[in-house]
């Protein structure tokens, strides 16, 4: 059975880990880095993922970044005349992570635990699960990122403690409060903001640079796509540098031009200025911190440890704000970029039975309910309820002789249905005609361990039942998922062939170089006939490379290899013959008794 890998599918970066021999290993990508940019690009029909995609983002408009922000929506991105859903783009990233995990483990990988922000709603969780399926992974569990981080932090901790996980990623923000003790990880409360992260901190720097440049030169760089991508890269770099130094130089030569010639952007950005620009973002993260404490019925003094997750928590102003709010230094013992994937791999170990005595009790981040008369949102399951859970409530009809009930399922905290996230609708039909208020309709909500919702409605009079697994308007049908799985497999096969072809071309080029070298060495040592045969084979391979016919390249490469081998054999045979004749001559010389007298002089050491 395949190992279960742990995947942190992030907005800006992703990470994959696995439990091996009781120890979690973060798997490096082919470039040797332990995290991979969540970037996908399309270029001449080829798909690029990770570092290579990010590197060419400036010049390639068909580059997709931060797709996680659109999970669970009906957003589509059009590339080269084809529309892609966020699930498909995420699946391309997952496929890449899966492929290098397989290279590392030396075996196929088909099972995974994938993390999501704690504040993801049902549609976003379902979309993540679908992305995993499209990538050829059986998603064993969807686990909340802060919970995964707590699992990684607390696995070897003996004492009972209450921890707050502050997770500021590239595009999402979560806070979870957990109680740890005796192998039980119990989430007490969770809060967050799905549209707040490192990208927003980059954006304030970009806006500042655009404004400064506009004031100085009267040119709006935000209208220039290529300039904007350069600004984005520079802003991200400056943000990272300002975590270690108090000022940084931003230098972007030839960023634009006017009638007088090229224009360059040269600017010094201080940490103080960056903190001023991003102060409102840092303050926005404090709202969910206070909310989580309130929901858990705790005060800052009750928190034993604060765990920081996500690269953006390296920003000094963020750490200062946490210290001010909670009155304690954040714990620095975990790697904020890797801790979530490590936790996911541990959860994989729990599912596979490799990790014993660990119980994970997570919660639902948002309240669940249905729309009732007057457009009111009636909650059935309150937020921060431990999952898995099930809850039933009896409702009745709103009109006389009503034979159908339309059930509208929602998720959120607002009192009116229209202000909450609609998860889907379904109908219970065949209710016997009766005066309003008489029929008894029982609605049951189930939330599984992945935080995914299943709903049943039952007419208690007839025992007629209708059930659905919630499919939001942005969700994919089974046929769509199957089609995408098939396309993903075909693309993986095409990628494999493309890689094989590139390797074959490299081998052919290498062989041509070696042939030229060998031909120089054998000049005058083997027959002209043999040399011509090798030269012809070399020219034939060059011609095949020009035509780019893979089968022909393979054939001509084998033929040239054979010809070069024959040359080498002839060369060795000749060398062996020469050595033999030289050996026999040397032997004959030794038979002559020519003794040469050597003159010598005695040296007196006592001189």
UniProtKB/Swiss-Prot annotation:
The recorded induction information for this protein reads: By stress conditions e.g. heat shock.
Per UniProt, the ranges with Acidic residues bias are 596-607
| One GO molecular-function entry | unfolded protein binding
Annotated keywords: ATP-binding, Chaperone, Nucleotide-binding, Phosphoprotein, Stress response
| Protein name per the record | Chaperone protein DnaK
List all Low complexity biased stretches: 575-589
Q: Which source organism?
A: Geobacillus kaustophilus (strain HTA426)
A matching Pfam family:
HSP70
Q: Which PANTHER family match?
A: HEAT SHOCK PROTEIN 70KDA
Q: Where in this protein does the record say Phosphothreonine is found? A: 172
Tell me which family the UniProt entry assigns to this protein: Belongs to the heat shock protein 70 family.
Describe its function. Acts as a chaperone.
Specify where the region named Disordered lies, as residue ranges: 575-607
């Amino acid at each position: 059975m395949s190992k279960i890998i742990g995947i942190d599918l992030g907005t800006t970066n992703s990470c994959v880990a696995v439990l091996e021999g009781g120890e979690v290993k973060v798997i490096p990508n082919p470039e040797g880095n332990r995290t991979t940019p969540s970037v996908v690009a399309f270029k001449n029909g080829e798909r690029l993922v990770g570092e290579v995609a990010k590197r060419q983002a400036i010049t390639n408009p068909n580059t997709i970044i931060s797709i996680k922000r659109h999970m669970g929506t009906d957003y589509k991105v059009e590339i080269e005349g084809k529309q892609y859903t966020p699930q498909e783009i995420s699946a391309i990233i997952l496929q890449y992570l899966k492929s290098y995990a397989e290279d590392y483990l030396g075996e196929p990988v088909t099972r995974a635990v994938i993390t999501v922000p704690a504040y993801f709603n049902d549609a976003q969780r379902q979309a993540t699960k679908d992305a995993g399926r499209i990538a050829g992974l059986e998603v064993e569990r969807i686990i909340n990122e802060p919970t995964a981080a707590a699992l990684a932090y607390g696995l070897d901790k003996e004492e009972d403690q209450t921890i707050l996980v502050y997770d500021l990623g590239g595009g999402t923000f979560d806070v979870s409060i957990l109680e740890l003790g005796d192998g039980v990880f119990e989430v007490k409360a969770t809060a967050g903001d799905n549209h707040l992260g490192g990208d927003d901190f980059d954006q304030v720097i970009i806006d500042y640079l655009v404004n400064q440049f506009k004031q100085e030169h009267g040119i709006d760089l935000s209208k220039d796509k290529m300039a904007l991508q350069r600004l984005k890269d520079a802003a991200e770099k400056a943000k990272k540098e300002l975590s270690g130094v108090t000022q940084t130089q931003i230098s972007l030569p030839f960023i634009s031009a006017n009638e007088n010639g090229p224009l360059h952007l040269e600017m010094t950005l201080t940490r103080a200025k960056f903190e001023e620009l991003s102060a409102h973002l840092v303050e926005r993260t404090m709202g969910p911190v206070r909310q989580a404490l309130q929901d858990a019925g705790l005060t800052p003094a009750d928190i034993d440890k604060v765990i920081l997750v996500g690269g953006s928590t390296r920003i000094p102003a963020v750490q200062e704000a946490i210290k001010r709010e909670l009155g304690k230094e954040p714990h620095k013992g975990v790697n904020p970029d890797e801790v979530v994937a490590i936790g996911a791999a541990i959860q994989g170990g729990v599912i596979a039975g490799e990790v014993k005595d660990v119980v994970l009790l997570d919660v639902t981040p948002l309240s669940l309910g249905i729309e009732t008369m007057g457009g009111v949102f009636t909650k059935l399951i309150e937020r921060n309820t431990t999952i898995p859970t099930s809850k039933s409530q009896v409702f009745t009809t709103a009109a006389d002789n009503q034979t159908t009930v339309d059930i509208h399922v929602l998720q959120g905290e607002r009192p009116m249905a229209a202000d909450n996230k609609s998860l889907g609708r379904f109908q219970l039909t065949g209710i016997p005609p009766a005066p309003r208020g008489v029929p008894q309709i029982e609605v049951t909500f189930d939330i599984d361990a992945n935080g995914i919702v299943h709903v049943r409605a039952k007419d208690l009079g007839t025992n007629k039942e209708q059930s659905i697994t919630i499919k939001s308007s942005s969700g994919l049908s089974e046929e769509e998922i199957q089609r995408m799985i098939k396309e993903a497999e075909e693309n993986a096969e095409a990628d494999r062939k493309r890689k094989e072809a590139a390797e074959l071309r490299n081998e052919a080029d290498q062989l041509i170089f070696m042939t030229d070298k060998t031909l120089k060495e054998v000049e005058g040592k083997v027959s002209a006939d043999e040399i011509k045969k090798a030269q012809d084979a070399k020219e034939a391979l060059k011609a095949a490379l020009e035509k780019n016919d893979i089968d022909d390249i393979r054939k001509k490469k084998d033929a040239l290899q054979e010809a070069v081998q024959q040359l080498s054999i002839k060369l060795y045979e000749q060398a062996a013959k020469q050595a033999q004749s030289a050996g026999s001559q040397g032997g004959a010389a030794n038979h002559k008794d020519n003794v040469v007298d050597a003159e010598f002089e005695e040296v007196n050491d006592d001189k």
